[in-house]
């Protein structure tokens, strides 16, 4: 028996697991210290009342013989797919319900979508980058080419005509940098993909945090994107579903390679390897897209974005360069005093008892930078900022 030796090419530990390990070790060495995390992007506010009510009603349904439900539809219940179609319609993006696949979060689908692509495809990935994009392709043994994100291009890499790629990862608003592609720059990627017969895997998990109405919140707002892009979205940060688990993937019927519709390939993959998201969770997700539910969710988003404003204000006062925080819950800052990413991590942890995420963990171009998130409790955020000011 042979193992998949590609796994041996992975880093020893997933970035956020490594951060958690270091924090745990520090706590053991310094008992009684109050640690405040502005690091991993988990939410802190509870689910919206409309979501709780819908899930409670669904639980009651499951307790009655007449309304009990077993296995659900492979693509997700029609009521949720219809709600998502309505949500996209407000963006002037028209989807068919057959193009929407309900899953347990963007992370899973971003990794699993690779099942429908050959392992000899060349993958183009931005650097800095969410580690899942890299690790899942290393696991499969694909060739990876990195495109440089830096202060000169505002951490928004653009196509290089001299590079030929088959699969392209884009995330906007970006994790970790908080940068957001405008329509003109995103159109350059769509044109590149169409010219090179490539497929864009577009992570829009943070689209609900975009406040500038001129910025796209779906790649399908760009002409031609339905012929070259798959979009992944999640309710984790938008609706507080990090522990509930629900997201969706859009695979347009227009998207084919050769004569093969990728929608059919993904459906075949899902019917074989995935049994769907629970009815109770999907009813909660449906409520999140209702008028009343979304208004409640918007209050949570506004709360987190006020946290982002406070973080940005503090960094400005300290003279620290940063990006993000305006249309994204992430703030990407340059480490002060020439410190490396992990040196700044250690300084914040030991001197301020504050946790963030070292930029180097997101790729070589992240060295010297650091990510803070706006998902904390307001009082904790204020306390953390006071500590940062005082070191």
What residue ranges belong to the model's regions?
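N-terminal small-domain helix-loop-helix segment of the aminotransferase-like
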Residues: 2-104, 112, 288-291
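Generic structural signal for small/hydrophobic residues in well-ordered secondary structure
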Residues: 19, 38, 55, 84, ...
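Helix C-cap/helix->beta junction micro-motif
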Residues: 30, 140, 195-196, 318, ...
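Conserved PLP-binding catalytic core of the aspartate aminotransferase-like
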Residues: 46, 304-305, 318-351
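Conserved core of the PLP fold type I
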Residues: 66-193, 207-222
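PLP-dependent enzyme catalytic core of the Aspartate aminotransferase-like
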Residues: 86, 94, 338, 347-357, ...
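Conserved core segment of the aminotransferase class I/II
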Residues: 221-302, 309, 313, 391
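Conserved glycine-rich beta-strand-loop-beta hairpin in the small C-terminal domain of fold type I
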Residues: 282, 286, 301-312, 322-334, ...
């Amino acid at each position: 028996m042979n193992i998949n030796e590609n796994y041996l090419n992975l880093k020893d530990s997933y970035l956020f697991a490594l951060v958690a390990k270091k924090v745990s070790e520090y706590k053991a060495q310094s008992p009684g210290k109050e640690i405040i995390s502005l690091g991993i992007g988990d939410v802190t506010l509870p689910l919206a009342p409309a979501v709780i009510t819908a899930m409670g009603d669904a639980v009651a349904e499951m307790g009655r013989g007449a309304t009990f439900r077993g296995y659900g539809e492979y693509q997700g219940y029609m009521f949720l797919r219809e709600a998502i179609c309505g949500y996209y319609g407000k963006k002037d993006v028209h989807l068919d319900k057959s193009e929407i696949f309900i899953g347990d979060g963007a992370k899973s689908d971003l990794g699993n979508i690779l099942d429908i692509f050959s392992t000899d495809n060349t993958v183009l990935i931005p650097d800095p980058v969410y580690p899942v994009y890299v690790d899942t392709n290393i696991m499969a043994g694909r060739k990876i080419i990195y495109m440089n994100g830096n202060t000169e291009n505002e951490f928004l890499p653009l196509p290089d005509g001299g590079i030929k790629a088959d699969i392209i990862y884009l995330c906007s608003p970006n994790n970790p940098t908080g940068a957001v592609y405008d329509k003109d720059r995103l159109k350059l990627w769509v044109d590149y993909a169409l010219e090179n017969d490539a497929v864009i895997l577009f992570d829009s998990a943070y689209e609900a945090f975009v406040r500038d109405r001129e910025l796209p919140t779906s790649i399908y707002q760009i002409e031609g994107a339905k012929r070259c892009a798959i979009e992944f979205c999640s309710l984790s940060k938008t609706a507080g579903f990090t522990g509930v688990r629900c997201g969706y993937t859009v695979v347009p019927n227009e998207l084919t390679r050769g004569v093969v519709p990728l929608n059919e390939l993904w459906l075949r993959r899902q019917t074989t390897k995935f049994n769907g998201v629970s009815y109770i969770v999907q009813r909660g997700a449906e409520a999140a897209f209702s008028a009343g539910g979304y208004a409640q969710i918007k209050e949570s988003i506004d709360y987190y974005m006020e946290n982002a404003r406070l973080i940005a204000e503090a960094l400005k006062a300290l003279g620290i360069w940063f990006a993000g925080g305006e249309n994204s819950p992430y703030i990407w800052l340059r480490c002060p005093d020439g410190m490396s990413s992990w040196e700044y991590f250690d300084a914040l942890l030991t001197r301020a008892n504050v946790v963030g995420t070292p930029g180097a963990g997101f790729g070589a171009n992240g060295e010297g930078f650091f990510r803070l998130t706006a998902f904390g409790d307001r009082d904790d955020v204020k306390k953390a900022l006071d500590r940062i000011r005082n070191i």
